[in-house]
């Protein structure tokens, strides 16, 4: 039986990608994230589907573009009902 690899997705709000001590930030100390990065994958050039956090998280969790998921903010009256969610896809893959 194939063993699934461990996946840890950290989603932060209002987080600068350079605010990490392992990314040589002069003041910020992030020892736990440093430890994770040493044994994992760090995407130094990752890009977001949209520039604001709510539609970007919706795109990440549903696999749909902002145009397709319709999410703009919390008060946009768009239902949070989509065909697929990342958690569901992980579950379907044995996680």
What positions do the PLM features span?
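Formylglycine-dependent sulfatase
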Residues: 1-95
């Amino acid at each position: 039986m194939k063993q699934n690899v461990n996946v840890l997705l950290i989603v932060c709000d209002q987080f600068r990608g350079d605010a990490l001590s392992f990314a040589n930030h002069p003041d910020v100390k992030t020892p736990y994230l440093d430890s994770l990065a040493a044994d994992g994958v760090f995407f130094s050039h990752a890009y977001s589907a949209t520039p604001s956090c709510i539609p970007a998280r919706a795109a990440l969790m549903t696999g749909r573009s902002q145009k397709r998921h319709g999410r703009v903010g919390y008060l946009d009256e768009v239902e949070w009902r989509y065909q697929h969610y990342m958690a569901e896809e992980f579950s379907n893959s044995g996680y």
